[in-house]
């Protein structure tokens, strides 16, 4: 593994779940990391596969934890999904299973809801997920709708442990229809390029930070960025042995970054 000169990096793309917080609890060192980003005038963007929350809700969540991060510093897989659909098929219609973050993102890009003959079936994390909605989605795909997933995460951390995430929820539709979904969140390079463009950075000037090898690290690596795997979420050091690629740096948590930057 290499080292990273964090002081020399211009932009930071950072995951949230398992990196900044776990459920409704802020992780050790997260506040110090965010304050360091702000105090040193780094460009930063929280790039999350969480499709359920809007940027405003994410801002409010961190505010309740004592952190002030403006809404423009969040980019979610729901926003990436809405951008993809608006670019591919302006004015299209969808049957969507998801929370406010996904539904609002779709509406904001002029995408309409349609449960009769939609162009796409779009699935994100959804508390309303049920056998009825699953059956509806399956039959719409069989009738010709294209299947879209907000992200390819199979699970995510919660206060209770682990919860199934988007890929686990969309899998029954894939199996029942024989159709493969297209996933818009990390590690899709479209989401990474959008993040870099929002930061105003080239890949060599940026760092990708996350707790997952299969989304965060690979997306950063394939985009040409330095990568940091933190062990505060779903990964352990043993996780590294499961993959053919490696992050640039492995840290216990993001709180290590300002400490390493101070050491030079």
Segments from the language model and where they lie:
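Conserved phosphate/oxyanion-binding catalytic-loop motifs
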Residues: 50
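Asp-based, Mg2+/Mn2+-dependent phosphohydrolase catalytic module
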Residues: 2-16, 21-42, 55-75, 82-264
């Amino acid at each position: 593994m290499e080292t990273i000169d964090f002081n020399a990096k211009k932009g930071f793309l950072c995951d949230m779940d398992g990196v900044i917080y776990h459920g409704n609890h802020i992780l050790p060192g997260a506040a110090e990391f965010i304050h360091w980003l702000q105090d040193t005038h780094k460009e930063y963007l929280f790039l999350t596969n969480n499709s359920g929350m809007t940027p405003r809700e994410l801002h409010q969540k961190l505010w309740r934890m004592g952190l002030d991060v403006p809404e423009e510093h969040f980019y979610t897989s729901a926003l990436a999904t809405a951008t993809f659909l608006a670019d591919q098929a302006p004015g299209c219609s969808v049957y969507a299973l998801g929370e406010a973050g996904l539904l609002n993102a779709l509406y904001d890009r002029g995408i309409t809801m349609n449960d009769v003959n939609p162009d796409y079936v779009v699935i994100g994390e959804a508390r309303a997920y049920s056998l009825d909605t699953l059956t509806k989605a399956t039959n719409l795909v069989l009738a010709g709708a294209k299947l879209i997933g907000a992200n390819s995460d199979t699970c995510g951390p919660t206060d209770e442990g682990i919860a199934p995430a988007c890929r686990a929820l969309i899998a029954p539709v894939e199996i029942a229809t024989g159709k493969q979904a297209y996933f818009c969140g990390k590690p899709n390079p479209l989401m990474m390029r959008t993040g870099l463009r929002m930061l105003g950075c080239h890949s060599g000037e940026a760092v990708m930070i996350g707790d997952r090898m299969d989304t965060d690290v690979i997306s950063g690596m394939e985009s040409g960025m330095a990568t940091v795997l933190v062990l505060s979420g779903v990964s352990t050091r043993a996780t590294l042995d499961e993959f053919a690629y490696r992050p640039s740096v492995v840290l216990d948590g993001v709180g290590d970054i300002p400490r390493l930057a101070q050491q030079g």
